[in-house]
Design a protein with these regions (language model features):
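Short, charged low-complexity linear motifs
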Residues: 1-4, 141-142
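N-terminal secretory signal peptides and thylakoid transit peptides that target proteins
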Residues: 3-32
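Conserved aromatic-histidine-acidic binding/catalytic patches
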Residues: 10, 37, 80
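Onset of an N-terminal alpha helix
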Residues: 12-15, 39-46
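Bacterial Sec-dependent signal peptides at the C-terminal "C-region" and cleavage site
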Residues: 30-40
Length: 172
């Protein structure tokens, strides 16, 4: 392998890139007191959470959860923000376990709403919901080139036209 190919390979498959790419699919261990209750991933919980916080997204064709993969690979998203989202997923699931003895993703929609109402009364929960909803609106209102605002559905829903000039390639 020539040096140029070797350098490209090492940049592409570095430990840092591997860890960044796997952030939302990494395991989150859920505890019930001192006992291990189960395991989930941030992306699995975020997919359900997005439906609960913005039920119209699916009907509109706005796919918000995969957008999180793109965003969390961007170097401008701080490690602290990433960790807060991951911890928020853990805390959300642990609240569901405390209230209903089940992880958040396995609850009925009405029970998930009860969990959301409960955590919204806490400082961390209010901040977590705010952060998740910020990313959801970013996905819904972003340029379709990023893959979440399919067919400009979010724009059409709000009777909005995107900014000009439109990007020719994704910048994330």
């Amino acid at each position: 392998m020539n040096q140029r190919k070797k350098d490209l390979f090492l940049r592409t498959f570095s430990r840092r890139n591997f860890l960044k790419a796997g952030f939302l699919s990494s395991a989150v261990f859920l505890m019930d007191g001192c006992n291990l209750f189960g395991v989930t991933t941030p992306i699995d919980t975020i997919k359900v959470l997005h439906v609960d916080l913005f039920p119209k997204a699916k009907q509109l064709g706005v796919i918000t959860a995969p957008y999180m993969h793109i965003v969390f690979q961007h170097p401008r998203i701080s490690t602290q923000d990433k960790e807060f989202i991951k911890n928020g997923v853990k805390w959300l699931n642990e609240e569901a376990i405390k209230m209903f003895h089940s992880s958040y993703t396995k609850l009925s929609p009405s029970k998930r709403q009860e969990v959301l109402k409960a955590i919204s009364q806490t400082k961390w929960g209010d901040s977590f919901i705010y952060n998740i909803m910020s990313y959801m609106f970013e996905a819904m209102l972003g340029d379709p080139i990023y893959g979440s605002n399919n067919h400009e559905a979010g724009w059409k829903w709000l009777h909005f036209s995107g900014g000009e000039p439109r990007p020719k390639k994704a910048f994330l």
